Amino acid sequence: MDTNNKDDSIIRFSVSLQQNLLDELDNRIIKNGYSSRSELVRDLIREKLVEDNWIEDSPDDKSKVAVLVVIYDHHQRELNQRMIDIQHASETHVLCTTHIHMDSHNCLETIILKGSSAEVQRLQLEIGGLRGVKFAKLTKASSFESNE
C-alpha cells in the first residue's frame, strides 16, 4: 500500500466479517443514517485516527484541540470561580467558552481547549472532580488531510 499517494481517489477493498458483526454494522448504518457501509467505515477509521493521535502525543506537542462540556449546579458555592481558576492555572490554552442556563439549577459550559493531550485531559479531570460538577466530557479532535 502506497501511503505517500495523497490523491483523493477512492480505493475499493474487501473486508471479511462474522455475520453478527455485519448485522451490527448494518444496524448502525440504519440507526445513524449513513448512506453506505463505506461511510460508516470511513468514520470509524477517522475516529480511531483521532484516538491514536492523542495517545501518540509527545509532551512538546501542544497542538491537541478538544471541547470540554461541563454541566454543573450553579448554586454550588464558588464553583464557577474555581472552574475559572483551574483554567487560568492550566498550561492548556482556553480558546473559547460558552455558558448557558439549562434550568433554574443547572448550567452548561463548553470550553474549547488547545494544548498537550496530558494537560488537556488533566484539566478535564480537575474540573470534573469539583463538587457540584454533574457531568464533564472531553471530546477530542484532530485535523485531517484535505482528502481524508
Swiss-Prot record:
A GO biological process of this protein is:
response to nickel cation
Key word Zinc-finger present: no
Q: Gene3D superfamilies of this UniProt entry?
A: ACT-like. Chain A, domain 2, Met repressor-like
On cofactor binding, the record's note says:
Binds 1 nickel ion per subunit.
Name a Pfam family for this protein: NikR_C
Does the record's keyword annotation contain Transcription regulation?
A: yes
Task: Provide the cofactor list for this protein.
Answer: Ni(2+)
Q: Which residues bind Ni(2+)?
A: H88, H99, H101, C107
> What are the protein's UniProt keywords?
DNA-binding, Metal-binding, Nickel, Transcription, Transcription regulation
Superkingdom to which the source organism belongs: Bacteria
Which terms does the record give in the GO molecular function aspect? DNA binding; DNA-binding transcription factor activity; nickel cation binding
The text of the family note is:
Belongs to the transcriptional regulatory CopG/NikR family.
General function of this protein = Transcriptional regulator.
Q: NCBIfam families under this entry?
A: PRK00630.1, PRK01002.1, PRK02967.1, PRK04460.1
Q: What is this protein called?
A: Putative nickel-responsive regulator
Gene source species: Helicobacter acinonychis (strain Sheeba)
The opening ranks of the lineage are: Bacteria, Pseudomonadati, Campylobacterota, Epsilonproteobacteria, Campylobacterales
